[in-house]
Design a protein with these regions (language model features):
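Short, hydrophobic/amphipathic alpha-helical patches that form generic packing surfaces
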Residues: 106-107, 132-136, 140, 176-179, ...
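A metal-dependent hydrolase signature that marks the N-terminal structural subdomain at the beginning
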Residues: 1-75, 200, 208-209, 213-234
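Active-site scaffold of zinc-dependent metalloenzymes
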Residues: 58-99
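Alpha-helix boundary/N-cap detector
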Residues: 1, 14, 18-32, 96, ...
Length: 234
């Protein structure tokens, strides 16, 4: 159940009734987004759940430069099995516009594909950690699969290119989250940007078995993305 953590937080009285009801009411937008991405890509969306807090990252010393992370792609080893989980923050579900929610879900899906690509090539260990938000945005942009190679859905592609010209900023949404969530002292999780970088041991990497068909699909998408990038350059 993708809402299990939210339900637990509500039962404990951490999330108030009105906020909880709003998230439940708007959750079908997330379900619609996941279905849309699966249809547009022909690939199943990874496990996703709603995190009942706002996730805030600051790069450390310059603590004034903080960013709200509306969703994160998290690799986990669970009972010797590797799984990628998409964490969607509750404030995104509560206050995001439909197009924004779908764009962020699609963006995390591209992260997921990128992660699987790296695992298949075994090049996860040397991934650099970038300490400032701008660098992270830049690293993000240079590595992700081209959305046009992955999704056959023009509206979805428009959402992605509008929302992520060079990293995601949605000031209206951020203002809402600050006003209705952070200022009301609702749950907040602080993460350092370093913890957003994936670290898996060589041993756990060697245990991961990918479905050969899925791996071939990833290779095809990588090839297609490369072609689109070349076109952009010339």
């Amino acid at each position: 159940d993708p809402l299990i953590r939210l339900k637990e937080a509500h039962l404990k009285g951490i999330i108030p009734d009105d906020t909880y009801d709003l998230i439940l009411k708007r959750f079908p937008i997330v379900v619609g987004g996941v279905n849309r991405i699966e249809k547009a890509s022909g690939i199943q969306y990874p496990v996703a759940y709603v995190e009942p807090s706002v996730v805030v990252s600051s790069p450390g010393l310059n603590s004034y430069e903080f960013g709200i992370l509306f969703a994160r792609t998290i690799p986990v080893m669970f009972e010797e099995r590797f799984q990628v989980v998409i964490q969607i923050s509750a404030p995104l579900v509560a206050y995001g516009l439909k197009g924004t929610i779908h764009a962020i879900l699609a963006h995390e899906f591209l992260h997921y594909l990128e992660l699987i690509r790296k695992i298949s090539k075994m090049d996860l260990l040397s991934d650099e950690i970038s300490g400032n938000l701008f660098e992270n945005v830049y690293a993000d942009e240079t590595r992700l699969f081209e959305s046009r190679a992955v999704f056959k859905d023009r509206t979805l592609l428009n959402h992605i290119t509008k929302k992520f010209p060079s990293g995601f900023r949605d000031y209206k949404l951020e203002d809402k989250v600050i006003k209705y969530w952070i200022d009301k002292n609702l749950p907040k999780t602080n993460v350092s940007l370093d913890s957003n970088t994936v670290k898996l041991s060589m041993e756990s990497l060697s245990k991961i078995r990918l479905d050969p068909q899925f791996q071939k699909r990833i290779d095809d998408l990588e090839h297609k993305s490369g072609k689109i990038r070349k076109k952009k350059l010339y």
